[in-house]
Curated annotation (Swiss-Prot):
Belongs to the UPF0125 (RnfH) family. InterPro entries: Mopterin_synth/thiamin_S_b, RnfH, RnfH_sf. NCBIfam families: PRK01777.1 (NF002490). This is Protein RnfH.
Length: 101
C-alpha cells in the first residue's frame, strides 16, 4: 500500500484528501476513490488536466508513495492576454508616478 494526496482548489477553498491505495493503482482510479468528484461535480475527469507534483501527467499513470495528485481548473483567460493586461497596467502605474518611459 502507498499513501498519496489528491488536491483540488477553487477560488474559495483548497482541498487535500489523503488516501491509501494499492501500489498498482492508477491516477484515475485514485481520483475516483477519493470522493473528490462527488465534492466537486464541476470536475470533468475526461477533460481535466491532472498532474503529480506540478508536472502534467496522464490519467493512466502509475503512482508512487508520497505522490500529490493535482487536478487543475481550466484557465479563465488566455495567458498571452493576461500578460498584455499586466503590461498595460504597469505602464499606466509608471505614468501616474511620473516614470514614463
Amino acid at each position: 500500500m502507498i499513501s498519496i494526496i489528491i488536491a483540488y482548489s477553487t477560488p474559495e477553498k483548497q482541498v487535500e484528501i489523503p488516501l491509501t491505495v494499492e501500489e498498482s493503482c492508477t491516477l484515475v482510479v485514485a481520483v475516483k476513490r477519493s470522493g473528490i468528484l462527488q465534492q466537486f461535480p464541476e470536475i470533468n475527469l475526461s477533460q481535466a488536466i491532472v498532474g503529480i507534483h506540478n508536472k502534467r501527467t496522464a490519467l493512466d499513470a502509475g503512482l508512487r508513495d508520497g505522490d500529490r495528485i493535482e487536478i487543475y481548473r481550466p484557465l479563465t483567460m488566455d495567458p498571452k492576454q493576461a500578460r498584455l493586461l499586466r503590461a498595460k497596467r504597469g505602464k499606466i502605474r509608471r505614468m501616474v508616478r511620473g516614470e514614463a518611459g
